[in-house]
Amino acid sequence: MQRLKSFYLETIIPKLKEEFGYVNSYRVPKLKKIVINRGFDESCQNSKILEVLLNELEIISGQKPIISKAKKAIANFKLKEKMPVGMFLTLRSEKMYSFLDRLINLSLPRIRDFQGINKNCFDGSGNFSFGLSEQSMFPEINFDKMIKVQGLNITIVTTAETNQEAFFLLKELGIPFRD
């Protein structure tokens, strides 16, 4: 079992029950999934660059991403139908906890002048989204093989009903929030 998951089960669940007064264990908020999204511009239409970005996301997450394609052509954006516009993947269960553990303990501390993540990024339903400006902070990425600096968006979906519940859950899991 992942270290972060066992920490959640043994330590965080009792704290959440005490803090919010849950009687039923099934009402306690938990992580549902983590969605990693990466969009790209027209310079990434080159198949080599696209393949490198795909491999980077696969190395970071341990799972192969799905390429999202344009549904219709838009001339102003120089976009053709079925042209790749981004990639995403959804992590659940063990891979989700593994990725979150590596993100909190290895990747975020490697960001230069990191002050913490803005805590105003909740959506009102207990989900938390934030963006990272570059992929080089992940220890799995070889800086020499990196062709293009490309950011990614991470959404952490929880079963929490309010932002306060989700904030308490993520704070206890160890996500460094800005004060």
Swiss-Prot record:
Q: Which InterPro entries match?
A: Ribosomal_uL5 (IPR002132), Ribosomal_uL5_bac-type (IPR020930), Ribosomal_uL5_C (IPR031309), Ribosomal_uL5_CS (IPR020929), Ribosomal_uL5_dom_sf (IPR022803), Ribosomal_uL5_N (IPR031310)
One Gene Ontology MF term: structural constituent of ribosome
Keywords carried by this UniProt record = Chloroplast, Plastid, Ribonucleoprotein, Ribosomal protein, RNA-binding, rRNA-binding
Instruction: Give me the Gene Ontology terms describing cellular component.
Output: chloroplast; ribonucleoprotein complex; ribosome
Q: Which Pfam families does the UniProt record give?
A: Ribosomal_L5, Ribosomal_L5_C
Q: Which residues cross the membrane?
A: none
Q: Does the keyword rRNA-binding apply?
A: yes
Entry annotated with the keyword Nucleotide-binding: no
Q: Where in the cell is it found?
A: Plastid, Chloroplast
The role this protein plays is:
Binds 5S rRNA, forms part of the central protuberance of the 50S subunit.
Q: Can you tell me which family this protein belongs to?
A: Belongs to the universal ribosomal protein uL5 family.
- Complexes and interactors: Part of the 50S ribosomal subunit; contacts the 5S rRNA.
> Which PANTHER family does the entry mention?
60S RIBOSOMAL PROTEIN L11-RELATED
Q: What is the name attached to this protein's record?
A: Large ribosomal subunit protein uL5c
Q: Which organism is it from?
A: Euglena gracilis
Q: What is the lineage of its organism?
A: Eukaryota, Discoba, Euglenozoa, Euglenida, Spirocuta
